[in-house]
Regions:
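Alpha-helical multi-pass membrane segments and their bilayer interfacial helix-loop junctions
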Residues: 1-235
């Protein structure tokens, strides 16, 4: 309606859509209605596209995505809704990729880098929240033991064999976030000397720290081993 017959200004329509999406998300959690939450997220992701006035204000776009994805993380704290997490992840990184291919220049680095880092860490956190929620719901089984100093090949094989079966490790979200975030990071740091190298150091440090944090949790062994594998890949 805004596009065909602009009765209201775009900011007002945008704000109304934000409120509507937030209300639907709250109702979805209270009523345990995953489909409603899914519709809210899809509508929320479509909102900036539907009400875009062509001004190209990317800071508003990325701030909105950060707010929306924070809401997804809040839902993940209470619900292990994997399709919802994946929808948010795919939509967010596709929007970022489309904008980057169309509009990114090195001058945008200082303002876009914080958003990229935030979403990388946020969706890594959502993968952790998913694992913990699945455990609390009884969705995990005991894992065969694997030494913390096991070779990388053994760790990857262990994850591939058991990660899907126990339904604790959301391998698509965890490794997909890693791959998408690092690819975008390499793209926006291409103008910097050794940009990709320093980015790999950062990723290795974060995943290594995450593995250390989970060192004492036997229930989340597969998640800890996944973080260790990610750290070794970037080391």
């Amino acid at each position: 309606a805004l596009k065909l017959h602009p009765l209201l200004p775009a900011p007002a329509v945008f704000a109304a859509m934000v409120v509507l999406v937030a209300a639907m998300a709250v109702m979805a959690v209270r009523q345990d209605a995953q489909i409603m939450a899914q519709a809210a997220v899809i509508g929320g992701m479509a909102a900036p596209i539907l009400v875009s006035d062509g001004s190209g204000n990317y800071l508003v776009l990325f701030s909105y995505l950060a707010l929306l994805n924070t809401g997804i993380a809040a839902i993940a704290r209470f619900k292990a809704w994997r399709p919802l997490n994946l929808t948010g992840f795919v939509c967010t990184f596709c929007i970022a990729l489309f904008w980057g291919l169309k509009s990114y220049t090195p001058a945008h680095f200082s303002t876009t880098e914080p958003f990229l880092i935030y979403h990388w860490l946020l969706y890594t956190l959502i993968a952790c929240l998913f694992a913990r929620r699945r455990l609390s719901e009884g969705g995990g089984d005991a894992l065969p033991p694997l030494a913390d100093n096991a070779p990388l090949g053994d760790i990857i094989g262990h994850i591939a064999k058991h990660g899907i079966r126990v339904h604790i490790l959301d391998h698509t979200l965890l490794f997909g976030t890693m791959a998408a975030a690092f690819a975008l990071q390499c793209g926006i740091t291409a103008h910097l000397t050794h940009g990709s190298g320093w980015s790999a150091v950062l990723f290795a440090a974060v995943y290594g720290a995450a593995a250390l944090v989970l060192r004492g949790s036997s229930e989340l062994a597969v998640l800890r081993q996944a973080f260790a594998a990610c750290a070794l890949l970037f080391a």
